[in-house]
UniProtKB/Swiss-Prot annotation:
Catalytic activity: an N-acyl-L-alpha-aminoacyl-tRNA + H2O = an N-acyl-L-amino acid + a tRNA + H(+)
Subunit annotation: Monomer.
One GO cellular component term noted in the UniProt record for this chain: cytoplasm
Active site residues of this protein: 17 (proton acceptor)
InterPro entries: Pept_tRNA_hydro, Pept_tRNA_hydro_CS, Pept_tRNA_hydro_sf
Described purpose of this protein according to its UniProt entry: Hydrolyzes ribosome-free peptidyl-tRNAs (with 1 or more amino acids incorporated), which drop off the ribosome during protein synthesis, or as a result of ribosome stalling. Catalyzes the release of premature peptidyl moieties from peptidyl-tRNA molecules trapped in stalled 50S ribosomal subunits, and thus maintains levels of free tRNAs and 50S ribosomes.
A single GO molecular function term of this UniProt record: tRNA binding
Swiss-Prot/TrEMBL site (Stabilizes the basic form of H active site to accept a proton) positions: 88
Taxonomic superkingdom: Bacteria
Location, primary (coarse class): cytoplasm
Pfam families registered for this protein in UniProt: Pept_tRNA_hydro
Record's protein name: Peptidyl-tRNA hydrolase
NCBIfam families: pth
Length: 185
């Protein structure tokens, strides 16, 4: 399962906080998929030779992302180790990514919410760099929109990541980490 973090609503589209949603939108459109709606999230499914890939976009605000997991667990019978969370990172330069097998919630409230509900941080995450915070107020920065040049760079990154993430598995995870973490757009 790939969970893209973001805030629902048009007012948040193309903001730095919504790169998780933007990447999932690219994967969905590139593969001719459609979103289906549940009470707390939207999702799409792909059947692959290696199994199915479920793409999820929460309908909750970022800081409440963990609240959808009771529904997800009952709907899809998933295991935490098969979860990949895609989110923004203000400490990474724009266009740089970091794929990690597990880790702490750090200061990201979306991850804190997920880890709190799951009772574990034993899941993978893909951090997408959204640029350095030149503003003092982190909230204003992550809710700000990208400029055209930044969007162009991110479009290339989303194309690359959509190809790389579709066939990610336990068997090839280390190779994907190396390829994704060494990329720069």
């Amino acid at each position: 399962m790939i969970l893209g973090l973001g805030n629902p609503g048009l007012e948040f589209s193309l903001t730095r906080h919504n790169v998780g949603f933007s990447l999932l939108d690219r994967i969905i459109s590139k593969n001719g998929l459609f979103l289906k709606r549940k009470k707390k999230y939207e999702y799409s499914e792909m059947r692959m030779i290696s199994g199915r890939v479920i793409l999820v976009k929460p309908l909750t605000y970022m800081n409440l992302s963990g609240s959808l997991f009771p529904s997800i667990f009952s709907d899809f019978y998933m295991c935490i180790k098969n979860l990949l969370v895609v989110l923004d990172n203000v400490d990474l330069p724009l266009g740089k990514c970091r794929l990690k097998e597990r880790g702490g919630a750090s200061t990201h409230n979306g991850l804190k919410s997920i880890s709190s509900i799951l009772g574990s941080s034993n899941y993978s995450r893909l951090y997408i760099g959204v640029g350095s915070n030149v503003m003092r107020d982190i909230k204003s920065f992550v809710l700000s929109r990208f400029c055209k040049d930044e969007i162009d760079r991110l479009e290339k990154l989303y194309d690359f990541l959509s190809d790389e993430l579709i066939d990610i598995s336990e068997a090839n995870f280390k190779n994907k980490v190396q390829k994704i973490n060494s990329s720069n757009f």
